[in-house]
Regions:
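Conserved ABC ATPase "signature" region
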Residues: 15, 19, 26-44
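Conserved ABC ATPase signature
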Residues: 48-52
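Catalytic Walker B motif of ABC-type/P-loop ATPase nucleotide-binding domains
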Residues: 73-76, 82
Length: 140
């Protein structure tokens, strides 16, 4: 969950969190536009967050995560509450991000994992029970 300032616009919210994470102004300007497009909020960039639906706020949270261009991104149940179109868009974003970043995706939605993961790790009661390459059986 991300704390939002309801009177900030989507763009201002992302800029603010990027600033807090130490992103320099030049990089922030280009990254904000890109992440807004990536999460399909570009058309809503000047709308106040208080007018956003739950799914839009969730996508805004994803944009906030991505704006600082981290090497590792951890998503916990990121597609819950997204409609099918936005779920597909998010999976495409994960595929794009995973080319240059390590993505850890925690989910109960098997189709999310099957479509975007290279490896599956199952943890039960804090213990690793499975580590497997998707499409193969070569445990590493």
């Amino acid at each position: 969950n991300v704390g939002y300032y309801p009177n900030f616009t989507a763009k201002k919210t992302i800029e603010y969190f990027g600033y807090l994470r130490g992103v320099n102004k030049k990089e922030l300007d280009s990254n904000v536009e890109q992440v807004l497009r990536d999460v399909n909020l570009y058309e809503n960039r000047n709308d106040k967050v208080k007018s956003f639906s739950g799914g839009m706020k969730q996508r805004l949270g994803i944009a906030i995560t991505c704006v600082a261009n981290p090497e590792i991104i951890i998503f916990d149940e990121p597609t819950v509450g997204l409609d099918p179109e936005e779920r597909a868009r998010f999976k495409n974003l994960i595929r794009k991000l995973s080319k240059t970043k390590t993505i850890v995706l925690s989910t109960h939605i098997l189709s999310d994992v099957e479509e975007v993961a290279d490896y599956i790790i199952l943890i039960k009661e804090g213990c690793l029970t499975k580590f497997e390459k998707i499409g193969g059986k070569d445990n590493e």
